[in-house]
Amino acid sequence: MPELPEVETTVRGLATVLDGQVIRRVAVNRADLRRPFPEDLAQALTGARVTGMGRRAKYGLIHTDRERTMVFHLGMSGRWRIDPEDIGKHDHLVLETGEGRVLSLNDARRFGSVDLVDTGRLEEWPPFAALGPEPLGPGLKARHLAKAFEGRIAAVKLLLLDQQIVAGLGNIYVCEALYRARIHPEREGGKVSARALGLLVPAIRAVLEESIAAGGSTLRDYARPDGELGYFAKDWRVYGREGEPCQCGGVVKRIVQGGRSTFFCPRCQK
């Protein structure tokens, strides 16, 4: 599943051809993805000017001058394509700008979603209302995590994946951040020290910023809107490296937490 860096990279790529442009044509090529497309999607977007782009958690935002925002989620396999050579069966939504640029939302597994939300009420929209702070924003501080983790016996790895605690973190980057902060993923949240939390926050930010700079991490279906792959996977220190040596001389181990693979070094993560 595309995580925060992949969505941020996607939004930035789309902005290069969409921001400030009028959407001349909208083609909705099927009725639904994970849930139905808004019935008025084509009508609401046709002729609208894009006034800005953004991201909240793992959602991309396309703001228009009609005070409506198109909110998209890439699901498991979704990606946007800019000026594709052809429109295939998995290109379920197509936008054409006044300058003739074409953007298609391609989603083979159809776990993504597209919604229309009143721009002024975005934070009240149910999927956003309970979200925690953005990990790259000023709201994520060690004291925020300390309060959220206080008295919790759940593993710190699982708590960091809770979108109500921190918005947008996913499996890959939580594994990598915990490794950099030298925190064992199974440690109870309430037992993570203030010192460790002080290391964790900058580790989260560093991992995300480095991944965004590398264009994200390409696993199976993800690619940037320009068709290029994300290259952060080559910099993974533990994720996907079960049995490989750690820099400390230990060996990377894999366990399962909450149905997801966790990678860590038992020697240097305590």
Swiss-Prot record:
Gene3D superfamilies: 1.10.8.50, MutM-like, N-terminal (3.20.190.10). Binds 1 zinc ion per subunit. A zinc finger (FPG-type) spans 237-270. The gene is mutM. Its EC number is 3.2.2.23, 4.2.99.18. This is Formamidopyrimidine-DNA glycosylase. The keyword Zinc-finger applies. It comes from Novosphingobium aromaticivorans (strain ATCC 700278 / DSM 12444 / CCUG 56034 / CIP 105152 / NBRC 16084 / F199). It catalyses: Hydrolysis of DNA containing ring-opened 7-methylguanine residues, releasing 2,6-diamino-4-hydroxy-5-(N-methyl)formamidopyrimidine; 2'-deoxyribonucleotide-(2'-deoxyribose 5'-phosphate)-2'-deoxyribonucleotide-DNA = a 3'-end 2'-deoxyribonucleotide-(2,3-dehydro-2,3-deoxyribose 5'-phosphate)-DNA + a 5'-end 5'-phospho-2'-deoxyribonucleoside-DNA + H(+).
